[in-house]
């Protein structure tokens, strides 16, 4: 393999240790950072994600609250619970695990979270503020990717960056953060013609579509940085990303693995956002 591996586990360990120090300092002043996680239904993947988030809180000195409800929970009941958490001074961050059951409007639920507790960064107030470069919170996955660029000294200013995927959770905010850092950004998606023509010209490619082998070695410029946000299963049932890792790692300069790349960083930045929320609350108290 010629590419340098961007190790999300190692970087997460460093950043979580820093978060734990900040949490301890806040707790000593009577402001232990608190995160509430709401899970509705029994989606197995969601259960794993929630378990990992709660464990990360416990391991780093955060107060955590897990609310688990059956899939039959009504939308008004969920909104009422969010309202309670908005008013709870022990809770600094509120996270509703997506996807929600079909009868619940996810958009309405996210908008019900107080913007100052929206540690996912999905509320329209934070999403809009991202355009101005002044959000209260940056969405966790793109924020984690930016920390990877910083840690591995990947130059962004003047770089050509391609983001494959246009979701509100990763693609769009990723493009905005790269733009803010001085990159020239192209967003590609399912309707893009000749994807390879864009990716071959890119110094940085972020793949975030949830589709195996969307990026192969012949589509990558030698020495480019490749970030794989995808989370899929291969034919053997093993975790894999959107990138053909075996092939692309022979061409790229830097690459993230799946697992062990972007995934751990997403939870780490959730802790960082919760710390920032707690620090703001403590300063205002």
From Swiss-Prot:
Record's catalysed reaction(s): (6R)-5,10-methylene-5,6,7,8-tetrahydrofolate + NADP(+) = (6R)-5,10-methenyltetrahydrofolate + NADPH; (6R)-5,10-methenyltetrahydrofolate + H2O = (6R)-10-formyltetrahydrofolate + H(+)
GO cellular component: cytosol
Keyword Membrane: no
UniProt superkingdom: Bacteria
Any Pfam family: THF_DHG_CYH_C
Keyword Hydrolase: yes
Entry coiled-coil feature ranges: none
EC number: 1.5.1.5, 3.5.4.9
Role: Catalyzes the oxidation of 5,10-methylenetetrahydrofolate to 5,10-methenyltetrahydrofolate and then the hydrolysis of 5,10-methenyltetrahydrofolate to 10-formyltetrahydrofolate.
Entries under PANTHER family matching the protein: C-1-TETRAHYDROFOLATE SYNTHASE, CYTOPLASMIC (PTHR48099:SF5), C-1-TETRAHYDROFOLATE SYNTHASE, CYTOPLASMIC-RELATED (PTHR48099)
Identification of the protein by name: Bifunctional protein FolD
